[in-house]
Amino acid sequence: MPGRELAPRQNVEFQTLDGLTLRGWLFPAQSRGPAVIITPGFNCVKEMFVSEVAESFQHSDVTALVYDPRTLGDSGGLPRNNIDPLAQVSDYSDALTFLKTLPIVDQTNISFWGMSFSALVALNAAALDKRARCCIAVCPLTGMQPEPDMLPKVLARCMQDRESQVVGNPPVTISVLTEQGRNPAGMGIGADKMEYDYMVNAKFRGAPNYENRTTLQSYYKMMAWQPFEIMKYLSKTRVLMIIPENDTISPADKQQVLFDGLPEPKTAHIAKGKGHLDVLSGADYEILAEMQAYFIKGPRGKGNAPSA
């Protein structure tokens, strides 16, 4: 982004309705105005992808809050790496409540942003919390259920784990990705060689709090979540969906089907030549960043952003 001196990011924390402390970074704008709430993807931490996104919003004079989801990174919650999507939906609302207390933020202009798994979380949060002005969903996942032949096995293992925990044993954890780039619970979270390399080595490449594992119960919670049903309540909340043309983790045609099913007002942008993990990088990202900032700052009720 063009160079101009910006306020340094601030370490912040806020409380959730159920008493957890979530911690992250605030990137203050130069002047009072809109703000955006950003969380990383499935089992990811704030050092992965999203701090650069926050900086791009800050360059456009939009205050950005990035935080580690509950049980991850610097945020509270036990057991660790226990992914609870519905709780994460609720946490977006608590983050919005926190931002409303900051003098730099226009209380009437706070938006939600998510990528991949967190794009679904952000869409659900915006559907249920009408205080959110709009929602930006980047490469949302479209398959949240295990493969049919694996579903009975996954549920059986979840029940065995529940019985084990009741008598005092620690929660069972499994890798997010195997060496073959597959999710061991059969969820639609796959990766090619480059994507696998990034994810398993993120801990050693700037994200020391990242762990390539989740609790087994995370998948029970994922199966109990019905994100696509909740999205029908998005009516009157503006949505911008960014669809990477070459996405192999969440295929572009399936993202388009998801977009087509959303209520108006909505806007889709196809990121040409981009995949799931590089959609937010490259020389052309500045154009995409400006599009997103325009969407957040644009007039109420208008769902269009400038074309890249």
From Swiss-Prot:
Induction: Coexpressed with the other cluster genes on brefeldin A production optimized medium. Keywords: Hydrolase, Virulence. InterPro entries: AB_hydrolase_fold, Hydrolase_4, Polyketide_trans_af380. It is an enzyme of class 3 (hydrolase). One of its GO terms (molecular function) is hydrolase activity. Pathway: Mycotoxin biosynthesis. It holds the Pfam family Hydrolase_4. SUPFAM superfamilies: alpha/beta-Hydrolases. Thiohydrolase; part of the gene cluster that mediates the biosynthesis of brefeldin A (BFA), a protein transport inhibitor that shows antiviral, antifungal, and antitumor properties. The proposed biosynthesis of BFA involves formation of an acyclic polyketide chain that is differentially tailored throughout the backbone. Belongs to the polyketide transferase af380 family. This is Thiohydrolase. It comes from Eupenicillium brefeldianum.
